Amino acid sequence: MSAKQPRLPLLGEITAPDGARLTVRVRARDDDAGAPVIVLLPAMGTPARNYLPLVRALHRRGMTVVTTDLRGQGESVPVPARGVRFGYRDIVEHDIGAVLDLVDTAYPTAPRLLLGHSLGGQLGLVHCGLFQPAGLDGVVLVASGSAWYRTLGRDGARWLVRSQLSALGAGILGYWPGERFGFGGRETARLMRDWARQMRTGRYTVPGARVDYERALRAVTLPVLAVDVENDTMAPPTAVDHLCAKMPAARVERLHYACADAGGRPLDHFRWIRHHGGLVERIGAWAERVVLASDRAA
């Protein structure tokens, strides 16, 4: 998707203690102050602007949609380079919470959901377990599973080798030039090490983390809609199930999004963003049934 496409209106900007800056944008339901707010966390190496077709569809379904880039992508600064050091810990323990605080201030009475794609969903869940954000009502995972190579079927060994070589290369170069290798976008060496470690071990183990991230996942109690996508070799059903199994206290509902649900259009780890026809309606229906009904009862 071209960067020349119109940008969403600005909701605010966030500056981290280390000087990193995130831009938060919103497509608001100005006609309904109580409309549910969905906060979209992108996949690794994927700018938030790539999700504009999905944002528009969710907005038409009656939701206010908030977007931000994962650190190092899109409008965020700094760009990963030699000497720029951040990883999973910075995103989990600062960035996601700062975005949710901004949303809480802007929409204090509205129901709020996280929608995480791939890495965005994984790190969003860890944040939820670690901080138990009071204003959050549920989490939607789409094409978001554990990156453990044993969950990736026949492609697992190839992904394991790729991940370890990527982390090694990033360590040598001081960053990962994913745009040159066709995978992952431009990332810091630290983030690539975090990703490669989880790929190898199946565990979210991050040096210097506030607590054990595996323990944080076990503390998630929110409603979770976990969607696997047909033809997705990067987050197949086994990978999604492995991530969900880490949250025994969560109220997890599983859903398979098939090409037939998308009107026969092709799907994979990224194509669902454009071919979202049947998925947006299911997300909206789940939110109304599980999350909004709970809010009304309270």
List PLM regions with ranges:
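N-terminal cap/lid segment of alpha/beta-hydrolase-fold proteins
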Residues: 1-28
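Conserved alpha/beta-hydrolase
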Residues: 48-50, 55-81
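Alpha/beta-hydrolase active-site loop
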Residues: 85-104
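Alpha/beta-hydrolase-fold enzymes
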Residues: 115-203
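Short alpha-helix in the alpha/beta-hydrolase fold that links the catalytic acid
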Residues: 236-246
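Catalytic active-site module of serine/aspartate enzymes centered on a nucleophile-bearing elbow/loop
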Residues: 253-298
